[in-house]
Amino acid sequence: MFTGSIVALVTPMDDKGNVCRSSLKKLIDYHVASGTSAIVSVGTTGESATLSHDEHGDVVMMTLELADGRIPVIAGTGANATAEAISLTQRFNDSGVVGCLTVTPYYNRPTQEGLYQHFKAIAEHTDLPQILYNVPSRTGCDMLPETVGRLAKVKNIVAIKEATGNLSRVHQIKELVSDDFLLLSGDDATGLDFMQLGGHGVISVTANVAARDMAEMCRLAAEGQFAEARVINQRLMPLHNKLFVEPNPIPVKWACKELGLVATDTLRLPMTPITDNGKEIVRAALKHAGLL
């Protein structure tokens, strides 16, 4: 369940900014039908930063309900206060989620020892499998391979979403962890190369709109059929890049609406709607991918 194409799912909203249950069901049905390995609910792409704590939990629980056992659900549970991250994680104990994705603390920029103590404390307060999440471009904090190696010894820390885009991290981390510790790319543009170097899958933004292609690409890569996987990846490459032409999830949410997967591309402030120029850029990438 922690391999292959795992979608970092958008959180669909109605035109008033409330979570849209019908669009969420449509998205989940789409991923079930497309072969997506699992859903990450309320991560960065799911607008965790602009949902209240109650809403955060409610969206994860709604996702579980609508998934109805058809696809594994991973809860985003990151926070930059350890006690808060523990509380959020514990909310999902016995909920049915298969694990938690927990980002490094943002803004307060802890030391490597602080990162170790933070994630160790969270893991010690739950039996749920924990996926570390390193994305320094957003957090201002880079969890180094040596720290990952230490954390991999904690029994229920089972994987990392590595989103630096630095492919040398694959080798660096693999040298420090056991063979059953999973490495997941958090960067669509380098995801296939990441898998070719020994990674196990991708937690993907692109999969929101190209679920079947991402699932097939990851399947081929896992089977060592990299030439075939690269044909798909080259077709998706403009999309991998242009879904970040404006800050995520602005472009991907609009793309979901453009493809009829959600009713609106409503975001909550401070996120604002995609510009007209951004629409044209993303539309061209969707066409290149064969989605329009």
UniProtKB/Swiss-Prot annotation:
A Pfam family annotated for this UniProt entry: DHDPS
Active site (catalytic residues): Y133 (proton donor/acceptor), K161 (schiff-base intermediate with substrate)
Keywords: Amino-acid biosynthesis, Cytoplasm, Diaminopimelate biosynthesis, Lyase, Lysine biosynthesis, Schiff base
A GO MF label: 4-hydroxy-tetrahydrodipicolinate synthase activity
Name by which UniProt lists this protein: 4-hydroxy-tetrahydrodipicolinate synthase
Single GO cellular component term: cytosol
UniProt xrefs under PROSITE patterns: DHDPS_1, DHDPS_2
Functional pathway: Amino-acid biosynthesis; L-lysine biosynthesis via DAP pathway; (S)-tetrahydrodipicolinate from L-aspartate: step 3/4
Subunit structure: Homotetramer; dimer of dimers.
Hydrolase recorded as keyword: no
Main location: cytoplasm
Function as written in the Swiss-Prot or TrEMBL entry: Catalyzes the condensation of (S)-aspartate-beta-semialdehyde [(S)-ASA] and pyruvate to 4-hydroxy-tetrahydrodipicolinate (HTPA).
EC numbers: 4.3.3.7
Keyword Amino-acid biosynthesis among record annotations: yes
Top-level class of the enzyme under EC nomenclature: lyase
Similarity remark: Belongs to the DapA family.
Compartment(s) of residence: Cytoplasm
Binding site for pyruvate: T45, I203
